Each structure stands twice: as C-alpha cells, then as structure tokens.
C-alpha cells in the first residue's frame, strides 16, 4: 500500500499519540534502509514490502508504549530490526533507555549495526546465538521477540535471562491460544493479553514470573 508521508504519520499517531517529526524522519530512514538492503539479504519477505509501514513498522511501534517507563530492553532474534530498531528510535526521542539486540546471522548483524550508526540509536548488537548471550546481557527489564519460535520454546530461550522483575512482550498470531495451552504444560507464568492495534487476530503476550515445572 503506497502511503504518502503524511498518511504514514497520521497512521503512526493512532499507535503513539505524540511523535516528533525527527522521529518520523528516523522511521522513514529505517524504512528506506530495509527496502535497500532487502534486495541483497532476506530481512523480510519480499511479498510484505508493500505493507512494510503497517505490517512491520507500526506493528513494532505498538510495543514500546506498553512499558516505556522501563529502561533496559533486550530483543531476541532481531533479524531485520523488528521490533528492536523501532523501539530504539522511540528511546532516542525520549532520551532514555537502551536496547540490546541478539542476532546470529552475520549479514543481518551488519545491517542492524549500520542502522544504529546512521540513526545514532541507543542500541547494541550482540552477534551470537541466544543461548550464548546470558554472560553478556544482565538483568534486562523487558525482553521482546517477534516471529522467533513457539511460546514453549521462547520461554526456554528467555528463562536464563529472567529476573523476578523481568517482563516479556511477545508478539503472537492467530494460534496464540494453542501456544499458551502447550506452554502451560511445562511452565507457570503470569499473563496479560494485549490485543494488537494492527491485526485483529494477533496479540502481544505480556509474561512475567516465569516458573518451570521441570525445575
């Protein structure tokens, strides 16, 4: 869908009520870098390029307001930078907070570091597997993941990073109820469900106080 810049800005304001023009410019710059780099490496499915603003950028933008008061974020399997780069752009506007990105693919790491440098974002990229990052990232207040794994596997991945105060914000599609049921066989957790503002079939699962039945 070919939105004008003003249309994109108005759509963004439906997600976040106050956005500076400088932040809008950063988001547009990020969008252009995605399109440019996606010709050479698979950051997002090429079929979603026409929907890049809504399906990826706005979908990511809705995450940050849920806990914008918390300062140390960590995004797992960051890929093309959704939601991590979008979150970092809003942190830059707020002049507070930092997000750590974890990505194992070297080409995607190069892309993420390029974006962070060009936009001067409060973010650090760790080029490693998620399982190996626990010695590098300590006590994140918020953990995010988008399209990474089923909930049961996600909880296994994030569990070593969790503290009593850590919140996980996990974006899930239409099968989220089944994923919750399957994960509940192995894990106990406190759960809040936030309906997506972009896709009526999707949710953001806010998970805390994760306990494993397996000890």
Swiss-Prot record:
Taxonomic source organism: Bartonella henselae (strain ATCC 49882 / DSM 28221 / CCUG 30454 / Houston 1)
Swiss-Prot/TrEMBL keywords: Cytoplasm, Methyltransferase, rRNA processing, S-adenosyl-L-methionine, Transferase
EC supergroup of this enzyme: transferase
This protein's name: Ribosomal RNA small subunit methyltransferase G
Listed EC numbers: 2.1.1.170
An annotated GO cellular component: cytosol
Catalytic activity: guanosine(527) in 16S rRNA + S-adenosyl-L-methionine = N(7)-methylguanosine(527) in 16S rRNA + S-adenosyl-L-homocysteine
Molecular function as annotated in GO: rRNA (guanine-N7-)-methyltransferase activity
Gene from which this protein is expressed: rsmG
InterPro entries: rRNA_ssu_MeTfrase_G, SAM-dependent_MTases_sf
């Amino acid at each position: 869908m070919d939105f004008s810049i003003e249309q994109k800005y108005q759509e963004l304001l439906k997600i976040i009520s106050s956005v500076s023009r400088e932040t809008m410019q950063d988001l547009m710059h990020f969008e252009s870098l995605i399109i440019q780099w996606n010709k050479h490496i698979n950051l997002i499915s090429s079929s979603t390029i026409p929907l890049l603003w809504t399906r990826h950028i706005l979908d990511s933008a809705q995450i940050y307001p849920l806990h914008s008061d918390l300062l140390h974020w960590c995004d797992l399997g960051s890929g093309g930078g959704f939601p991590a780069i979008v979150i970092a752009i809003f942190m830059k506007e707020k002049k507070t907070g930092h997000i750590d990105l974890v990505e194992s693919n070297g080409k995607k790491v190069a892309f993420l570091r390029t974006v962070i440098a060009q936009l001067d974002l409060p973010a650090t990229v760790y080029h490693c597997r998620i399982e190996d990052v626990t010695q590098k990232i300590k006590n994140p207040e918020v953990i995010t993941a988008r399209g990474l794994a089923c909930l049961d596997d996600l909880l296994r991945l994030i569990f070593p990073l969790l503290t009593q105060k850590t919140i996980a914000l996990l974006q899930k599609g239409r099968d989220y109820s089944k994923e919750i049921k399957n994960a509940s066989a192995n894990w106990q957790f406190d759960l809040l469900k936030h309906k997506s503002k972009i896709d009526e079939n999707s949710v953001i699962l806010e998970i805390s106080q994760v306990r494993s039945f397996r000890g």
